[in-house]
Amino acid sequence: REKQHLYYRSGGTVKDTANFLKSQIGNYYFKTNKFQAETKVDVTNKDGSTLVSDHLDYYTSSGIADLFGPSTITNVENKIYTEKGSHNSKTNISHFIKNSIIYYSDRIVKGDSLYYNKNTDFASATGNIEIIDTVNASIIKGGYAELFKLKDSMFITDEAVAISEVVENDSIYIHGDTLLITGKLEER
């Protein structure tokens, strides 16, 4: 009681205005409004998105979850995998910094560091980026990229290269300082 520390070791559930969190092990620190969850962590947001991890620190006042170890965020539009980063369940803005991948229905985005805003469907990737476009059978690589899903466009800088399969076993490579790739005008 003096420590202002609540804990459980054999499964528990915590609910706030935005999320419903379940885990095997949990610690809540009243002074910092920090909930530390470990082992089979499952967070469901009021919009239906889920976050699954083995360890996260969740701050109830801000809605920020710091993720440690393999973690997956799934919603209707996409699925995100990371091994370290943070996700704000109130603003739907995330920043991932280790082995991070965004899986869209038509492309996969990888990078050393990923920023994602679910509200605007905007993502940026920094360092060793790779974008696999399944619709156009192409791979785009570079050092920095920004993707605007709603506008069906992206630009890539820092040793940007686009590799497109023309026919089976034959590809075309396009390289430039900056590459801008857009979908068909009538479909944007």
Q: What are the residue ranges of the model-derived segments?
A:
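Structural signature for solvent-exposed beta-strand/loop edge elements and short helix-capping sites
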Residues: R1-R188
